[in-house]
Amino acid sequence: MPGITFRAVSKRFGNSGTLALQDVTFEVPQGSTCMLVGRSGAGKTTLLRMVNRLIEPTSGTILVSGRSVLDEDPIELRRHIGYVIQQVGLFPHMNVAENIRVTAEVAGGWSRSKLDARVDELLHLVGLPPAEYRRRFPRELSGGQQQRVGLARALMTDPAILLMDEPFGALDAITRGQMQDELLRIQRDVKKTVLFVTHDIEEALKLGNLVAVMHHGKLLQLGAPADLLTRPTDQTVARLVGSDDVLRELRFLTASCAEDASYTGAPQDAGPLPRCAPDATLLDAMLSLFRTRAPALVLEAADGLPARHVTLESIISTLQKGAP
C-alpha cells in the first residue's frame, strides 16, 4: 500500500485565484523517502502541508495509508504524522527530554516510565547520549543538536509518516552533511514514509529513493535519482538536476548502473578480482579500479546468482549514454 497518495491535487490562494498547485498526481511508497525539489514558488511546501492539513486542497484527493486526509479530524491526523521544520521549534523553557516527550503527553495514554524510556531510546537513535543531553535546554545546543532533538520529537509517537520541510537548510555545510548521513542511518532503522522538501538537488539525490521535481505548481518528473540524472524528461529538469554534470553523476550513480555484460573474464594468472557493493558510487568503483589496476570489479550478489562485473569502459559508457 502506498504511504502517501496525491490524486489530481490543485490549490488556489486568495481572491485572485493564484494557482499554487495544478493537478499533481503521484504516490510515495510505504517506507520510502520522497524528496520534493524545485525553485522557490514551485509548490513544494504547499503540497507537503496538505498531508497534515495545515493547508487544504482546492480540489483533488490526498490519501495517507489508504485513507483520505479530509475524512480525518485534523488534530488527530497530526498526532500520527511527524513534522520537522527548519526552525526546529523547540520550546526554550523546556529541556531536551521535555521537548521530545511533549507530543506523546498531548496525545495521552503514556506512563511516565514509558515516556522516559522512549525519550532515551530516541536520543540514542539520533546520536545524543541521554545522560549528557536529556536535561539540557535548547540554548545549550548547537544547531545540529537542536535538529536532532527536533527529529527525535517528530518520532516520539512512532508515526508512519514523517514530513520534513527543509530541516537542514539553516545549518552550515559540514553539519548539514552530517545530518544527512544521520537521517540515512536512522531511516534504515525506522523505515518511515518520508516526504522531504529541499531546494538542494544534491541533498535530494543523496537522501531520496524518489525525487519529485516541481516547477510552477506542476510535477515535471518523478523518479529515482539515477533516472533524473540520466533520463530527464525535459530541459527544465535537466538544468535543475545538472544532468550534464559528470562529477555529480560519478557521486550519485551507483555501480549497478554500469554493469559490463560483455566482460568475458580476466586472464587466469591475474588473480581474484576485487569486489564492489552494487550501491557503491561510480566514483568509488572507478577509484577502486585505478588503485588495484584490476581489469574489472565483481559486483557483490546473493549466493547462487551469476557474477556481474564493472569495468572502466562500462563506467565511461554509462556517463556518456546514461544508466541502462
Label each residue range with its predicted role.
Residues 222-223, 231, 309:
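ABC ATPase "signature
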Residues 113-132:
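Conserved ABC ATPase "signature" region
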Residues 156-160:
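A short, proline-enriched helix->beta-strand linker immediately N-terminal to the Walker B motif
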Residues 52:
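Helix-to-loop junction immediately C-terminal to a conserved catalytic motif
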Residues 68-82, 106, 112-113, 231-232:
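ABC ATPase NBD coupling module
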Residues 97-106, 116, 120:
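Short helical segment in ABC ATPase nucleotide-binding domains corresponding to the A-loop/adjacent helical element
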